[in-house]
């Protein structure tokens, strides 16, 4: 007996293939940068971009396999979780940037705890959303699907709250270091202003994407956003591709410290 399709529309092969190609190229670019700079804490960018590549590839393949549950689960899970991995590297970069500028006293949270607190919260969001996606993909009833959507919604809301708290830490640090620059901010090799600007851009894009997902799941499976394909590409795929493009110029290995400076790759 043939399985019933979980797709409310026929996934586009063309758009899916385009996004798969874009994310594959971005994965290669990030991998090259990673090994050239040795910034191993940026590995979540690579893993997340691989998730996106496989996820959109699965969407494209689903055009001719709409009844395939494995393909449906694969694309739903990987595309949902990839931005959480991007956020993990964003969180880790702020702490290293604070250390590089010698401005630890300007952070409202001890620098050694920034990564632990926010990446820990990120892992929690990952687990919640993964559980919700699993429940949703395997549900055979409306009640089961609603439970899965509610769990995902909870994970997304927690992620937004954590991200807003992170932005508060970044903004306060930014304000303090601009009003009272440290000696290390004069070092031309430490492009802290550019990196903070890019951090804000990336954070806003990820937040917009998360808000889109909240609205999408809050509206339910019969809502416009889940019933149509274009929103996921405009408010998720394109935004996350921009995030990866921006962050490809953001590897802190380019800010090579002197021997007496704090290593940006340290925890």
What do the PLM-derived regions correspond to, one by one?
Residues 1-83, 87, 96-99, 106-115:
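Membrane-proximal first intracellular loop
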Residues 38-39, 65, 141, 228, ...:
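Short, solvent-exposed helix-helix connector turns and helix-capping sites enriched
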Residues 3-5, 137-146, 182, 221-223:
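Membrane-interface helix termini and inter-helical loops of multi-pass transporters
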Residues 24-31, 80-107, 123-137, 161-178, ...:
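Cytoplasm-facing ends of alpha-helical transmembrane segments in multi-pass membrane proteins
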Residues 13-17, 72-84, 129, 146-163, ...:
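Extracellular loop 3-seventh transmembrane helix
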Residues 175-191, 250-267:
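Intrinsically disordered, low-complexity terminal tails of fungal membrane proteins
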Residues 52-63, 129-140, 170, 206-220:
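Helix-to-loop junction signature of class
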